[in-house]
């Protein structure tokens, strides 16, 4: 269903389905927005903009807070929908809802700190700074965090006075529609937030629509590159890209074998590796301790149970296509000279559930620098800490990196040298603070980080000099 002007309407475009990735059952059916409907959705957002933007921050915030109260009240329902539609285990789905609920306070603080008003009185003049909303912003959501990541754009955009067209992932329409239901119950004025299902054609149309002022996208580098090409014709529009990573986890100078293996395991395999910050590459010292860590990691992987849903550490990959691409990626690595430590395979009777892949890439003839969205870890051994840093940087991505070490003095040179936007010590690569920016460099984005800095691309500054005649 489409949602605009506070009304629900069936789409007139191509039909599509949401499929439970664990068992293959069809759990939702609907249609994309037609071109005519999409124009109506954008018009709805445009007509609502000035009325929303001219409300005081206090009034806008009161409605937004009501949405968060409703989300908290209905968090069990949201958790169930996320788990059903993405395949996440319930604890992982509940964690996403918790992360979304924590977004409000950080967004308000960021708005006031980074895009609020400011007055500086000097001897002969006053300098004034205000911020204005852009207008209609289109949020293109991902499947892996269908609530939390779109919400990371939507909340700061609404706070700043923008109106929203939300185009969710085709894999998670139920979560999107329930999110819209809660926003409607919160009492947002008609047209302030709108929902349009669709695929590439809908996204392309939103990019080119004259009334749409920006695209806030979370997803793969390949799609982000396509969006950049389209938006090159519209340099006056905002484009914020939150893309993927080929993230390294470096282990150096630690005797805590079990603790290191636990951090590596969670970094690589949480959410079946379907987080942009998951560790993709493990860089170990070429020592006895390095080999002990690898052996401990192998034991943890082999101990995983895939017998029943209640036993799962992680859920399935999002689709049959994703599963096929994951397994093909594994074969590509092996064809290039990588060696199997533990080979991933599909779990019988579980549709898109796969076992983890542990691959030694030491002898590869050519590095394959791509983000592989699944439970795979590529293992390398190095002789020096500088060699570990060099290998960590041997990627065109730059989202997340981690260092595990008993020697904390190594962290400062690691942070200074490693090209990534999120760098953690003795923590998972997937850990990030909502009070800081979230983003990377290179193929991981276009230097418009989300998180605390999302406020920056949701408003534009007006600087004034005020003098007396």
Regions inferred by a protein language model and the residue ranges of each:
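Conserved C-terminal structural/oligomerization subdomain of aldehyde/semialdehyde dehydrogenase
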Residues: 22-29, 212, 250, 346, ...
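Rossmann-like NAD(P) dinucleotide-binding subdomain of oxidoreductase/dehydrogenase enzymes
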Residues: 116-259, 287, 382
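Structural signal for hydrophobic packing residues in well-ordered secondary-structure cores
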Residues: 49, 53, 68-75, 79, ...
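ALDH superfamily catalytic-core signature
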Residues: 223-362, 425
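Short, well-ordered beta-strand elements within core beta-sheets of diverse protein domains
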Residues: 27-33, 48-54, 138-139, 249-252, ...
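N-terminal Rossmann-like NAD(P)+-binding subdomain of aldehyde/semialdehyde dehydrogenases
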Residues: 1-125
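A short hydrophobic/small-residue beta-strand
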Residues: 163-165, 340, 422
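Residue-level signal for inorganic ion chemistry
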Residues: 24, 60, 82, 104, ...
């Amino acid at each position: 269903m489409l949602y605009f002007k506070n009304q629900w309407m069936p789409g007139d475009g191509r039909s599509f389905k949401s499929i439970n990735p664990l068992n293959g059952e069809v759990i939702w059916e609907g249609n994309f927005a037609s071109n005519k409907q999409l124009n109506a959705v954008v018009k709805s957002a445009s007509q609502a903009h000035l009325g929303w933007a001219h409300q005081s921050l206090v009034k806008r915030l009161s409605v937004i807070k009501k949405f968060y109260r409703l989300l908290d009240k209905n968090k069990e329902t949201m958790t169930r929908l996320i788990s059903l539609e993405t395949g996440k285990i319930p604890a992982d789905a509940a964690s996403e809802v918790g992360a979304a609920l924590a977004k409000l306070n950080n967004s308000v603080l960021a708005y006031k700190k980074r895009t609020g008003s400011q007055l500086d009185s000097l001897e002969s003049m006053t300098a004034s700074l205000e911020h204005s909303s852009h207008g209609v912003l289109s949020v293109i959501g991902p499947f892996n965090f269908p609530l939390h990541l779109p919400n990371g754009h939507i909340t700061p955009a609404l706070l700043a006075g923008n109106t929203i067209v939300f185009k969710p992932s085709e894999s998670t329409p139920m979560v999107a529609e329930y999110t819209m239901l809660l926003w409607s119950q919160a009492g947002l004025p008609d047209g302030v937030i709108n929902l349009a299902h669709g695929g590439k054609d809908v996204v392309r149309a939103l990019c080119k629509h004259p009334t749409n002022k920006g695209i806030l996208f979370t997803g793969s580098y390949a799609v982000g590159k396509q969006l950049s090409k389209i938006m090159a014709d519209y340099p006056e529009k905002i484009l914020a890209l939150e893309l993927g990573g080929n993230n390294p986890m470096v282990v150096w100078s630690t005797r805590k074998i079990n603790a290191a293996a636990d951090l590596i395991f969670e970094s690589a395999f949480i959410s079946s590796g379907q987080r942009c910050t998951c560790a993709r590459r493990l860089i170990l010292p070429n020592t006895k301790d390095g080999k002990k860590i690898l052996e401990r990691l192998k034991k943890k992987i082999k101990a995983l149970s895939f017998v029943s849903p209640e036993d799962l550490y992680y859920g399935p990959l999002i689709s049959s296509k994703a599963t096929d691409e994951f397994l093909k990626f594994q074969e590509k690595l092996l064809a290039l000279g990588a060696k199997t430590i533990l080979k991933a395979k599909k779990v019988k009777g579980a549709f898109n559930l796969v076992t983890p892949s542990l691959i030694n890439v030491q002898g590869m003839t050519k590095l394959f620098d791509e983000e592989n969205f699944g439970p795979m870890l590529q293992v390398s051994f190095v002789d020096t800490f500088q060699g570990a840093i060099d290998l960590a940087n041997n990627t065109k991505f730059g989202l997340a990196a981690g260092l595990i070490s008993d020697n904390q003095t190594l962290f400062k040179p690691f942070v200074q040298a490693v090209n990534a936007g999120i760098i953690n010590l003795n923590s998972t690569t997937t850990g990030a603070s909502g009070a800081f920016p979230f983003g990377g460099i290179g193929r991981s984005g276009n230097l418009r980080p989300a998180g605390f800095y999302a406020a920056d691309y949701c408003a534009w500054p007006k600087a004034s000099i005020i003098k007396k005649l």
